């Protein structure tokens, strides 16, 4: 077959009759006395002649397009022939042979056809760049020969059940199974389970695939028209189901080589890292290669992975628990034991070990490899925070009154700091002298602040190898020497920032140090950490300063300090335990050892909420032409769903409404996503991809038959009363939205206070 295909293309510029002798002699190598496989030739031409088409055939197509469309269906044993054909295709441009019928010339192209053939140079470049993307991503540590179909079968089982314990059992059993074959299978498999391509702080891992691109790819790969795909999508709202249905009824010329976990994961990373000219075409080519090889339910979950939403009710913390159980059994060589149960206290200890490790080193590859090398029960010794990897920041619980603060810290030594109205900034100095700045959700935002150089704030560079600081980046007026509102900070560019372009200066207000010269400080008291901070760093007015603080338990002094913080353009106070184990830094935890007291929220629920924009309602009157209101939802961390909690239309300026219209309109989708939990009576005029968070104030919370937040806890959902827009949260991803559990907790605390 390899010779046959090569012969077909090499002779493609000749009339069909003159090519037949060559084709008839180009069968597979045969032993002496064996006749050429003419039946194979007949099937080959018949499949091309009978290829279903739509639209008007182009009078001339590039041979590269014709070839790649046909070769999207070739893999496995035909890989050699594919490469040879691609090398040859770019030197030929052919017209459709009339004797084979017009169907041959109208084989659908994967690239937009203008009726003009690509030049050989353009064709060669596109093919080469696609293969470069694949080869450059060929990392051995992501290799896995586990059939992708096995992962999809697990996803299918999980989708059909709701019991969290059963999901944990299914996941842990599968992790144990693949570790028996090879422990290297675990890393790419885990990333597929949590639907990520690497750690959050690694740049360039956003797939960036819109619905239209995926629809077009499914259309061209599966021989369906765009109108058919869109009609079906409007009906069922699941591109994965559509791709599975279309793929399973489509015949292929060759039996594709089965997909593996390693292949799928590497290709997903290659798609994410594909940028620049023709990037969309190159991404489509990579998707087609996988989609063509999909069987059964594989297409369904491949497309969902490409959408970055599996929608099977598998939360990341469930995967972490499953991993801890599997790794614990792996350590104890109990995978084959008929009784895999382990004592609950041991299992809970293993779960806590892996949670703590991941909060300090949010990188599954490092955490899993450390477990495999040292054992999960030794993670706290070998897998700890390190400069260059952003740990998940400690967070504070909201409170509504100074009396509540005094009650919480009664008999304890505590301290209060200004709560600055800026952007959380975790600053790392690395051994090689480079600096990195990370946001609260782990995004590398070093390039956003070119004017900051941490080495300017170090007391002794000769003795300081590395460190990690916890700070707030605040807009600063250098002329008047004062803090500017957050709205001023938000006007700074977020990408491609040049030093000469900086108009809004920032000052770093440091309030904690977490690591110094490889010494982990999070298990020291806040009082000790403050001593480290002032010893190794120095104040540079207007550039690097310490958070203003006071240590007192006097009610009047605290009230005065709160008023002063507001007068200095701050949000309020952060009140923290100062001494003892309770003052240790707890990565990722929203702890009652840190309380936030915001002046604006003393009469409300005690805190603002960060809610995801799910849809919008058209404006009327003076708001005609923009959106007049928005449907907001919280995030359920257990199910991965967004649960509606209010409609908001207050707090917006005309300028903000126009900005939101321009920002959100490109994200409109045809209907609600399967992860949106809502009541039809609150259905908006348009639905959006979940991309944007609003920070919202509310007077209080109430139960509602219309909204769905926390409905798993109550008979009704929890809704916000009189919500008011504050700002867009640029520093948070949508999965960092206020959770359903947090809304339930706020409602219960409010009810308790009222009673």
Swiss-Prot record:
The active site is at 419 (n6-amp-lysine intermediate). ATP binds at residues 417, 424, 440, 576, 590, 596. Residues 309-318, 493-495 are annotated as: Interaction with target DNA. The lineage of its organism: Eukaryota, Fungi, Dikarya, Ascomycota, Saccharomycotina. It comes from the Eukaryota. This is DNA ligase 1. Residues 1-44 form a transit peptide. Cdc9 is included within the category of so-called 'start genes', encoding proteins which are required in early G1, when the cell is faced with the option of initiating a further cell cycle. Present with 149 molecules/cell in log phase SD medium. Mg(2+) 1 binds at residue 472. Keywords: Acetylation, ATP-binding, Cell cycle, Cell division, DNA damage, DNA recombination, DNA repair, DNA replication, Ligase, Magnesium, Metal-binding, Mitochondrion, Nucleotide-binding, Nucleus, Phosphoprotein, Transit peptide. Belongs to the ATP-dependent DNA ligase family. Its EC number is 6.5.1.1. GO terms for molecular function: ATP binding; DNA binding; DNA ligase (ATP) activity; metal ion binding. Mg(2+) 2 binds at residue 571. It comes from Saccharomyces cerevisiae (strain ATCC 204508 / S288c). SUPFAM superfamilies: ATP-dependent DNA ligase DNA-binding domain, DNA ligase/mRNA capping enzyme, catalytic domain, Nucleic acid-binding proteins. Disulfide bonds: none annotated. It is an enzyme of class 6 (ligase). The modification Phosphoserine is found at residues 58, 75, 119, 123. The record marks 164, 441, 622, 647 as: Interaction with target DNA. DNA ligase that seals nicks in double-stranded DNA during DNA replication, DNA recombination and DNA repair. The mitochondrial form is required for mitochondrial DNA maintenance but is non-essential while the nuclear form is essential for cell viability. It catalyses: ATP + (deoxyribonucleotide)n-3'-hydroxyl + 5'-phospho-(deoxyribonucleotide)m = (deoxyribonucleotide)n+m + AMP + diphosphate. Residues 102-114 have a biased composition (Low complexity). The gene is CDC9. The keyword Cytoplasm does not apply.
């Amino acid at each position: 077959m390899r010779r046959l295909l090569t012969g077909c293309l090499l002779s493609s510029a000749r009339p069909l009759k003159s090519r037949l002798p060559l084709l008839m002699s180009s069968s597979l190598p045969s032993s002496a006395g064996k006749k050429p496989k003419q039946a194979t030739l007949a099937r080959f031409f018949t499949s091309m002649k009978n290829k279903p088409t739509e639209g008007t055939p182009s009078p001339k197509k590039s041979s590269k397009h014709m070839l790649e469309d046909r070769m999207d269906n070739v893999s496995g044993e035909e890989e050699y022939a594919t490469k040879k054909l691609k090398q040859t295709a770019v030197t030929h441009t052919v017209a459709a042979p009339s004797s084979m019928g017009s169907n041959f010339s109208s084989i659908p192209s994967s690239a937009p056809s203008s009726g003009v053939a690509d030049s050989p140079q353009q064709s060669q470049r596109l093919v080469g760049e696609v293969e470069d993307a694949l080869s450059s991503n060929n990392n051995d540590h992501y290799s896995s020969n586990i059939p992708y179909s096995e992962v999809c079968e697990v996803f299918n089982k999980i989708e059909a059940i709701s019991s969290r314990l059963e999901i944990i059992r299914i996941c842990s059993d599968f992790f144990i199974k693949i570790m028996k074959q090879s422990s290297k299978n675990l890393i790419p498999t885990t990333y597929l389970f949590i639907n990520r391509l690497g750690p959050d702080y690694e740049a360039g891992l956003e797939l960036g695939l819109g619905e239209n691109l995926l629809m077009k790819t499914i259309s061209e790969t599966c021989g369906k028209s765009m109108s058919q795909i869109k009609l079906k999508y409007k009906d069922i709202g699941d591109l994965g189901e559509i791709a599975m249905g279309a793929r399973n009824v489509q015949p292929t010329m060759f039996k594709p080589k089965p997909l593996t976990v390693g292949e799928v994961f590497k290709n997903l990373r290659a798609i994410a890292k594909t940028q620049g000219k023709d990037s969309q075409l190159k991404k489509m080519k990579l998707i087609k290669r996988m989609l063509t090889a999909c069987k059964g339910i594989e297409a369904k979950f491949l497309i969902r992975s490409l959408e970055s939403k599996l929608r099977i009710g598998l939360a990341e913390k469930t995967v972490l628990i499953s991993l801890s159980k599997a790794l614990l059994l792996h350590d104890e060589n109990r995978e084959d034991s008929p009784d895999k149960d382990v004592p609950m206290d041991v299992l809970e200890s293993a779960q806590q070990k892996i949670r703590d490790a991941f909060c300090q080193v949010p990188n599954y590859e490092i955490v899993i490899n450390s477990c495999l090398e040292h054992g999960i029960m030794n993670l706290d010794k070998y897998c700890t925070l390190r400069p260059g990897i952003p740990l998940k920041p400690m967070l504070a619980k909201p409170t509504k009154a100074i009396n509540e603060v005094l009650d919480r810290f009664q008999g304890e030594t505590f301290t209060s700091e200004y709560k600055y109205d800026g952007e959380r900034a975790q600053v790392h100095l690395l051994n090689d002298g480079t600096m990195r700045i990370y946001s609260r959700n782990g995004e590398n935002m070093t390039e956003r602040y070119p004017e900051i150089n941490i080495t300017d704030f170090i007391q002794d560079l000769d003795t300081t190898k590395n460190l990690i600081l916890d700070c707030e980046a605040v807009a600063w007026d250098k002329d008047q020497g004062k803090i500017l509102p957050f709205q001023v900070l938000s006007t700074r560019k977020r990408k491609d920032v040049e030093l000469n372009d900086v108009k809004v200066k920032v000052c770093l207000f440091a309030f904690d140090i977490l690591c110094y010269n490889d010494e982990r400080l999070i298990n020291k008291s806040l009082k000790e950490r403050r001593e480290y901070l002032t010893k190794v760093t120095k104040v540079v007015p207007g550039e690097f300063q310490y958070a203003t603080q006071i240590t007192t338990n006097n009610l009047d002094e605290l009230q005065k300090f709160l008023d002063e913080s507001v007068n200095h353009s701050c949000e309020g106070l952060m009140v923290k335990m100062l001494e003892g184990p309770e003052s240790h830094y707890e990565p990722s935890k929203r702890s009652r050892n840190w309380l936030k007291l915001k002046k604006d929220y003393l009469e409300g629920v005690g805190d603002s909420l960060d809610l995801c924009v799910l849809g919008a309602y058209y404006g009327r009157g003076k708001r005609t032409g923009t959106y007049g209101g928005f449907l907001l939802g919280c995030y359920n961390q257990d199910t991965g769903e967004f649960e509606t909690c209010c409609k908001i239309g207050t707090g917006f300026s005309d300028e903000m409404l126009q900005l939101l219209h321009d920002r959100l309109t490109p994200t409109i989708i045809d209907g609600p996503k399967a992860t949106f939990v809502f009541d039809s009576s609150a259905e908006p005029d348009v639905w959006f991809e979940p991309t944007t968070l609003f920070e919202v104030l509310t007077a209080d919370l109430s139960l509602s038959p219309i909204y769905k937040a926390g409905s798993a806890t109550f008979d009704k959902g929890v809704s916000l009363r009189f919500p008011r827009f504050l700002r867009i949260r640029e520093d948070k991803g949508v999965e960092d939205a206020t959770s359903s559990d947090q809304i339930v907790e706020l409602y219960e605390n409010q009810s308790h206070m009222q009673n």
